[in-house]
């Protein structure tokens, strides 16, 4: 007869059983952040850095959208224009449209991000109320040239849009 105890290790310490269940999760030890990670987080907690970064990214998005939508435009060209003249005319229109979109999206990103960061720091909370307030500030300031009624409509519209986008992305994360 074969001895069954010979197959077992003789370390003296009994090891805990390993869970073979796929649903069980392994507990990971807590890892403290490094100095570089702490400094990087401190940089991103600065409202000016957030606002400028959002402004630059918004400007880039506006530039790309302006180029794309400018290319889709069907400008009124005269039959007397040569192909080269039509190309130059279309390129100028695309450039002008993309530059205008770039400026608009840059200001929008900068104002929204700065307002949200300032409200978040003042309230010491990260929730949807910050998004609504920042959306109101952004929408109101972007449409303020149209008068107080336009500013109120812009405030309500952009705040609603911002909250809906926030809820949509929170649901999918």
UniProtKB/Swiss-Prot annotation:
Tissue distribution: Expressed in young cotyledons, roots, flowers and leaves.
A biological process term (GO) from this entry: embryo development ending in seed dormancy
UniProt entry tagged with the keyword Ribosomal protein: no
Targeting signal (transit peptide) range: 1-18
Membrane topology: Multi-pass membrane protein
Phenotype upon loss of function: Embryo lethality.
TM annotation in the entry: 52-72, 101-119, 128-144, 151-168
InterPro entries reported for this sequence: TIM22 (IPR039175)
Subcellular location: Mitochondrion inner membrane
Induction record: Up-regulated after antimycin A or rotenone treatments.
Assigned GO CC terms: TIM22 mitochondrial import inner membrane insertion complex
Main subcellular location of this protein, as a coarse class: mitochondrion
Region (Disordered) residue spans: 1-26
Keywords: Membrane, Mitochondrion, Mitochondrion inner membrane, Transit peptide, Transmembrane, Transmembrane helix
Pfam families: Tim17
Role according to the record: Essential core component of the TIM22 complex, a complex that mediates the import and insertion of multi-pass transmembrane proteins into the mitochondrial inner membrane.
Family: Belongs to the Tim17/Tim22/Tim23 family.
Protein name from the UniProt record: Mitochondrial import inner membrane translocase subunit TIM22-1
């Amino acid at each position: 007869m074969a001895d069954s105890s010979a197959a077992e290790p003789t370390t003296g310490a009994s090891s805990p059983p390993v869970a073979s269940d796929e649903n069980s999760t392994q507990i990971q030890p807590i890892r403290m952040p490094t100095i570089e990670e702490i400094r990087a987080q401190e940089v991103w907690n600065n409202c000016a850095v957030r606002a400028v970064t959002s402004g630059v990214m918004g400007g880039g998005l506006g530039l790309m959208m302006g180029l794309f939508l400018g290319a889709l435009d069907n400008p009124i060209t005269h039959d007397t224009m040569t192909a080269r003249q039509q190309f130059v005319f279309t390129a100028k229109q695309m450039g002008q449209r993309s530059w205008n979109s770039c400026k608009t999206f840059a200001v929008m990103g900068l104002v929204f991000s700065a307002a949200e960061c300032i409200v978040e720091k003042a309230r010491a909370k990260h929730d949807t109320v910050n998004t609504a307030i920042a959306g109101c500030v952004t929408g109101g300031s972007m449409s303020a040239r149209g008068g107080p009624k336009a500013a109120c409509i812009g405030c309500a519209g952009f705040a609603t849009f911002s909250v809906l986008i926030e809820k949509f992305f929170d649901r999918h994360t």
